[in-house]
């Protein structure tokens, strides 16, 4: 049986750990509130640019390369993770899904390219010998589009240059504070953009200046980049929610452990006192 000193030491260290996890839980809750608001506030912009692009794309006979499927020789994967851990299954779930997808779809490394946001994702793929052609790490808790502008632009440009022929995103979609969904989304080509145009929008008459083709040339890359940024905002909210949940679970587990250790301490202390009394009584009896 552990000594009273050992048990008391474990109680003290567990209490200190629970104070840390409780503080992290509260910090994550505050960050989640801001991240959720950021993600929600970006939705109207993304929906509007999608609506405009869809209206133009469905109303013109011109076809932009970003709207057209082509024979797939190489596939790109954009995987969004975090820079820090202590977020439960947040990173492991998304990385497992992306890795298994790549392994099941491709026989050779020449058939795919990986782009990563987040240090944990970068280290995961490099550890497994999977080359990462582009990466962004060190993002703060509140990200701005400028933080990923270069990566987003270069990713879209690589598709235009036929460095790969299709692009998928893997990220955690925020559902609620206790639920996040691993999501795979086909980003390029934008073959389903016409579905975003409502019947009223399709039938509406627009006059474009400059031409529809020139507008699409500018708007389509911006739209694809906005999808990447929107997924990152979604992922940030999911990260803080997952970390808040993980820290709450750790705090609850610490409390249970403290209760159990306290019970063990009291029992051990009672046994020690009983032993001392027995020895005293036995010693007194021996002197009679």
Swiss-Prot record:
The keyword NAD does not apply. It comes from Bacillus pumilus (strain SAFR-032). It is found in: Cell membrane. This is ATP synthase gamma chain. Produces ATP from ADP in the presence of a proton gradient across the membrane. The gamma chain is believed to be important in regulating ATPase activity and the flow of protons through the CF(0) complex. It is a peripheral membrane protein. It holds the Pfam family ATP-synt. PANTHER family: ATP SYNTHASE GAMMA CHAIN, ATP SYNTHASE SUBUNIT GAMMA, MITOCHONDRIAL. InterPro entries: ATP_synth_F1_ATPase_gsu, ATP_synth_F1_gsu, ATP_synth_F1_gsu_CS. It comes from the Bacteria. The keyword Transferase does not apply. One of its GO terms (cellular component) is plasma membrane. Belongs to the ATPase gamma chain family. GO terms for biological process: proton motive force-driven plasma membrane ATP synthesis. One of its GO terms (molecular function) is proton-transporting ATP synthase activity, rotational mechanism. F-type ATPases have 2 components, CF(1) - the catalytic core - and CF(0) - the membrane proton channel. CF(1) has five subunits: alpha(3), beta(3), gamma(1), delta(1), epsilon(1). CF(0) has three main subunits: a, b and c. Keywords: ATP synthesis, Cell membrane, CF(1), Hydrogen ion transport, Ion transport, Membrane, Transport.
């Amino acid at each position: 049986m552990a000594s009273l000193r050992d048990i008391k030491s474990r109680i003290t260290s567990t209490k200190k750990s629970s104070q840390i996890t409780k503080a992290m839980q509260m910090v994550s809750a505050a960050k989640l509130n801001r991240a959720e608001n950021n993600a929600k506030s970006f939705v109207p912009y993304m929906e509007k640019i999608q609506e405009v692009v869809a209206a133009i794309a469905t109303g013109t006979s011109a076809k932009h390369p970003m709207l057209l499927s082509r024979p797939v020789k190489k596939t790109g994967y954009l995987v969004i993770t975090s820079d820090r851990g202590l977020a439960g299954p947040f990173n492991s779930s998304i990385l497992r899904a992306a890795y298994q997808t790549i392994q099941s779809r491709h026989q050779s490394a020449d058939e795919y390219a990986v782009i990563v946001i987040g240090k944990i994702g970068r280290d995961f793929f490099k550890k497994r010998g999977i080359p990462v052609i582009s990466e962004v790490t060190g993002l703060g808790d509140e990200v701005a589009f400028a933080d990923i502008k270069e990566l987003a632009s270069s990713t879209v440009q690589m598709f235009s240059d036929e460095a790969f022929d299709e692009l998928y995103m893997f990220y955690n979609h925020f559902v609620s504070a206790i639920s996040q969904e691993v999501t795979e989304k086909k980003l390029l080509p934008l073959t389903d953009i016409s579905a975003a145009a409502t019947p009223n929008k399709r039938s509406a008459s627009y006059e474009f200046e400059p031409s529809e083709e020139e507008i699409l040339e500018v708007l389509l890359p911006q739209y694809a980049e906005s999808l990447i940024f929107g997924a990152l905002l979604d992922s940030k909210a999911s990260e803080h929610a997952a970390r808040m949940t993980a820290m709450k679970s750790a705090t609850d587990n610490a409390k249970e452990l403290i209760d159990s250790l306290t019970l063990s301490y009291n029992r051990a202390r009672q046994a020690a006192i009983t032993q001392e009394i027995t020895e005293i009584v036995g010693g007194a009896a021996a002197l009679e």
